């Protein structure tokens, strides 16, 4: 059996690993996405902005990657909203490239 857990903030990562998670997933919604689309067009299935269910800064993602390197439990980033409009794909690509550049390479993608 594989335990997969949703991460709401980077502070939860170590607790999830210690509790036995084999894999973690999270949403990353940078400011540039929120500024342009807000939650009218969410980036993933966790559409709320004002609760602790999204990571919102690249600096936090860099810290999370360092934790992944230490604890060896992978993190998958979600881009799995029900649909995207054509103009969003360029920004999604940029966001994914930013994440790849800091070491993330597993994504859940839907359109």
Regions found by a protein language model. Name each.
Residues 1-110:
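Non-catalytic helical/linker scaffolds that mediate oligomerization, partner binding
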